[in-house]
Amino acid sequence: MLWTPLRFGKYEELTLPEVVLRDPNWFFWQCGKSAFGGGDLAREAGWIRRQARAIKLPLENPNLSEVEYMFDRNGKLRHVTVVNAQHNRPADSGSIFRKNIDLSVPHEVGKQDCNGGQVIIEFLKRFVFCDEGITLTTEICEEFFDDDDNFDL
């Protein structure tokens, strides 16, 4: 897909795949404000929004696993991991569980959680891209979102 560069804000000239993998909180905040207007950018934002909430676990048998998002007492995301879907969840553990990787979780749960977006991107780099030190270039970000196999839609 030919992605449209932003023409506003702190991520001007970046495409939405880059933005959501750089700062998911900012992306979802802008979606909530309908900041992407109409036209191509709005369509792309809607598509990226759906994809970013449904990233498949890159496992041979993903139905046996789920993503655990662990929060501190203040509602800030502190850790993300993959756990066995059959494990017993302690009541009131401060965690939420999802079938897929959902980049919107830090924004949806902790509205003022500036660090949560980075926590989830670090997890994504480690677990999906298998490289904590990877630089998520324009090409890598766009190729990731262009590949439907990465998403459970």
Predicted regions and their residues:
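Accessory DNA-engaging acidic/polar modules
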Residues: 1-153
